[in-house]
């Protein structure tokens, strides 16, 4: 006879004792269960004990989380969290260095448990740890353990980072600025200062004033990935918290100190693979670099500005200097103005007064900056572009100014200039760290590409929008390849000619037309169930392999990782925390389990409880797109297992796999693409023998029935 649903079979162990195998009744109060367990080992005062999960972070079991205990769970009997907190805090205040060190070693693994953390915090544990950190008597293991424990306790959000004292923050800053100490201390100190900077603007200003940028550069140049990542994290946090003017000064100084070259040579092109955290911080740094262009992009040209009028004249003279000098000599003011207006028209401005063209925002003054940069840094290419087009047949000239304005808008859209940084994105372009003035240099490549494509298309003024669509496609396809240098980008984008774009479009069109014939559609419909089963199998296999997820709180992007996978029999989701850089854990080492039978629904996007309170700002758009949750039964309550996918592809794979486990359709974009690819391949295989045989649009007509059904048989023929 099967046991009741609320009874689970578990093992409980204790040091120097024979483990107990019991049937735990989840309806029985936890205090009564503890009393029975203690009685079996002849232990008195059961209120002094508590149960913990034996695996992972040894979390304490309470009435709130006891539903996580499943059949086969292994628990251990340990000291109650309040008594354990008192003992460890007593050890921290002892005069014995060894006793303090041992207490810290026991405190660190328990600090991630909310129950234990509350007990420590309520007993002034943070103040005790803060005193140890401020005293700095031991710059080795004791300090490292103290910083780790302090950060773990603060991560629970029970105490605000804004409550930290200025002397404490300054002491942590000292550990960042010091040289002689244990190698594990600087990354922990940098991580703590990053949390302070992101959470408290006032303390963030203190950190910015106390931590020299040169010191962060020193940490970045140490060939230690963890130290480099933490230094880059603090650097991007300081940049994000700075005003636009301060941010520009900071970035200018960092570029003067060759940070860009160091990142390009020693981080991007490092022999060791780049971690996800570093990729995210490089994405943020790139977004902040491009964000410096936003004020110019949002500012229209001021027709009353003497400086801007002079810049326009410089642009005109760089193209028509000889012609202007020879033809303008001795002319009246009206004739000279008429000549200038005609030359601005030749430059490709739509109006004789170029200020009217540059009043549009975006791109505003950024388009003028790009044109000036091109004329000054590639004068021969600039003159050739303008003079070549001004001498072409009417309506066939490529308008330089109009093309520059539209190209600047296009580049701002492709590179998302001025958009808020995503909390999870890792999509940076190595090319931007390999070149000074990368945006302007990219414009120089793009404007010459525009002229080249214009000639290939033999375009007229009426074809301007069509040409810009082709140029957008050329630039977008090449940027997606993530070229590592501007020269490589130039080579690849010039190889993508208009003819190649047409070929790609024709291939896509023929592919689409070939798959829309009625017989092909019927064949595809017959193949769909089998191929959907294949996709379902692949999704479940991917879940069995497991994925490393990153924990993200409502406050900031965190460094903690956890691993989740599906058991081989597809009956359990197993998960647990792990350190970055560690090898994938085995199923046996994952402490948490969620039976598939207990899963009720899959939630995505803003419906997920862990992103519901984060607001609706643009900066959270990417977070919503990667968030999903599983609701499941935990006793009489509904609980959630929350995920933030590391990428859009992982989001699709996991939501598809979980939908398959729940018996729901797999409706992701990735499933549609995979199904389309499989259908195309399978259809082509089925039609190999029909090459050069036309496939009719309609099936052959069914012949009319005979006039009668009087069939004739020759009965004289003997059957064999």
From Swiss-Prot:
SUPFAM superfamilies assigned: ARM repeat (SSF48371), PH domain-like (SSF50729)
Q: What is its main location?
A: cytoplasm
User: Can you name a GO cellular component term?
Assistant: cytoplasm
Q: Which Pfam families match?
A: ELMO_ARM (PF11841), ELMO_CED12 (PF04727), PH_12 (PF16457)
Q: Which domain of life is it from?
A: Eukaryota
- What is one Gene Ontology biological process annotated in the Swiss-Prot or TrEMBL record? actin filament organization
Cell compartment(s), UniProt: Cytoplasm
Q: Which residues form the PH domain?
A: 542-664
Q: Any idea where the ELMO domain is?
A: 307-479
Query: What is the protein's given name?
Result: Engulfment and cell motility protein 3
Organism from which the protein derives: Homo sapiens (Human)
């Amino acid at each position: 006879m099967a046991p009741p649903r609320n009874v689970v079979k578990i093992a409980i162990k204790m040091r120097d004792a024979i483990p107990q195998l019991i049937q735990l009744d989840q309806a029985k109060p936890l205090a009564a269960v503890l009393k029975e367990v203690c009685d079996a080992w002849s232990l008195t005062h059961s209120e002094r004990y508590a149960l913990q999960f034996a695996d992972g972070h040894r979390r304490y079991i309470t009435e709130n989380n006891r539903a996580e205990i499943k059949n086969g769970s292994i628990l251990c009997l340990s000291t109650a969290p309040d008594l354990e907190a008192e003992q460890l805090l007593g050890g921290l205040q002892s005069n014995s260095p060894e006793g303090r060190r041992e207490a810290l070693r026991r405190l660190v693994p328990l600090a991630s448990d909310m129950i234990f953390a509350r007990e420590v915090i309520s007993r002034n544990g943070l103040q005790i740890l803060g005193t140890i950190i401020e005293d700095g008597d031991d710059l080795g293991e004791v300090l490292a353990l103290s910083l780790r424990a302090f950060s773990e306790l603060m991560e629970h959000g029970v105490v605000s980072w804004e409550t930290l004292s200025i002397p404490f923050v300054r002491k942590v800053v000292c550990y960042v600025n010091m040289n002689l100490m244990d190698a594990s201390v600087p990354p922990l100190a940098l991580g703590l200062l990053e949390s302070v900077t992101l959470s408290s603007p006032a303390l963030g200003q203190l950190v910015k004033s106390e931590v020299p940028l040169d010191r962060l550069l020193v940490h970045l140049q140490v060939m230690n990935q963890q130290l480099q990542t933490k230094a880059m994290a603090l650097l991007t946090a300081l940049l994000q918290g700075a005003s636009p003017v301060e941010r520009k000064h900071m970035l200018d100084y960092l570029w003067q100190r060759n940070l860009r070259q160091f990142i390009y040579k020693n981080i991007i092109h490092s022999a060791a693979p780049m971690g996800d955290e570093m990729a995210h911080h490089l994405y943020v740094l790139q977004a902040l670099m491009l964000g410096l262009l936003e004020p110019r992009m949002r500012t229209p040209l001021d027709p009353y500005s003497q400086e801007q009028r002079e810049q326009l004249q410089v642009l005109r003279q760089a193209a028509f200097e000889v012609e202007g000098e020879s033809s303008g000599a001795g002319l009246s003011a009206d004739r000279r103005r008429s000549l200038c207006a005609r030359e601005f028209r030749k430059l490709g401005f739509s109006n004789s007064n170029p200020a009217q063209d540059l009043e549009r925002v975006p791109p505003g003054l950024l388009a003028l900056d790009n044109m000036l940069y091109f004329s000054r840094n590639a004068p021969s290419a600039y003159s050739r572009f303008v003079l070549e087009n001004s001498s072409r047949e009417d309506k066939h000239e490529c308008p330089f100014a109009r093309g520059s304005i539209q190209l600047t808008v296009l580049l701002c859209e492709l590179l998302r200039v001025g958009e808020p940084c995503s909390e999870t994105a890792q999509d940076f372009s190595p090319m931007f760290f390999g070149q000074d003035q990368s945006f302007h240099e990219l414009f120089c490549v793009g404007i010459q590409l525009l002229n080249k494509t214009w000639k290939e298309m033999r375009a007229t003024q009426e074809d301007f929008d069509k040409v810009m669509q082709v140029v957008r496609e050329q630039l977008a396809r090449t940027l997606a390849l993530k070229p590592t240098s501007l020269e490589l980008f130039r080579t690849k984008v010039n190889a993508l000619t208009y003819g190649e774009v047409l070929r790609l479009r024709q291939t896509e069109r023929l592919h689409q037309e070939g798959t829309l014939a009625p017989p092909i559609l019927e064949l595809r419909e017959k193949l769909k169930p089998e191929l959907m089963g294949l996709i379902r199998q692949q999704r479940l296999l991917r879940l069995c392999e497991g994925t490393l997820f990153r924990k993200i709180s409502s406050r900031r992007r965190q460094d903690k990782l956890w691993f989740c996978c599906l058991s081989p029999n597809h009956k359990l989701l197993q998960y647990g925390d792990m350190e970055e850089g560690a090898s994938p854990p085995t199923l046996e080492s994952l402490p948490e389990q969620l039976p598939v039978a207990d899963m009720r629904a899959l939630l995505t996007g803003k419906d997920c409880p862990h992103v519901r309170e984060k607001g609706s700002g643009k900066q959270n758009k990417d977070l919503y797109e990667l968030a999903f949750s599983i609701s499941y039964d935990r006793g009489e309550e509904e609980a959630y297992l929350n995920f933030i996918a590391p990428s859009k592809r992982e989001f699709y794979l996991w939501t598809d796999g979980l939908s398959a486990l729940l018996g729901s359709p797999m409706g992701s974009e990735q499933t549609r693409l995979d199904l389309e690819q499989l259908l195309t391949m399978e259809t082509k295989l089925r039609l190999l023998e029909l090459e050069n045989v036309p496939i009719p649009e309609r099936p052959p007509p069914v012949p009319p029935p005979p006039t009668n059904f009087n069939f004739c048989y020759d009965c004289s023929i003997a059957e064999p």
